[in-house]
């Protein structure tokens, strides 16, 4: 009887181990970036290997306010001239688990559009969103109300097709290509893998 129970327990352990291994396997390119950075951001952040990408100088940090939120920026030489910055950041808190990639593109001397690619690791969802940034009195005002964002973009002649092009230029052709250059990815900028994509401007 004990032998049978031992065999059953061993079998259950094997099944659980296989299940755990399977569920932890990256199902898409954003899973890869999230998992590999989570493993390394406290020691030798894997993203340091991207040419021209600079981890925020305060990392790694033991400050409880930003312990789980590492980020970095591309330097000016590696940032296309139409953009003021490109950032890759994370929130590794168990309640969040988010990877975000954003770029800021100028529309005028005091107005720019921020294109977000936010990946929710827990749910496997990539959200593509746009925010307007206005410079007022040496400070920045962020506008994320969808109708206001759309109105501003229309004023500057920016269409949904343009937003797709901005997203593709930075996320696909820049960040994800760079990722594939430093990591033996199963995926690519044209093949994300298993991920649900939600686009804010899809029906604009």
Language-model features: where?
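N-terminal export/targeting and maturation segments
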Residues: 16-109
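Generic detector of bulky aromatic hydrophobic side chains
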Residues: 4, 8-10, 40-43, 55, ...
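Hydrophobic membrane-insertion alpha-helices, especially the h-region
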Residues: 4-22
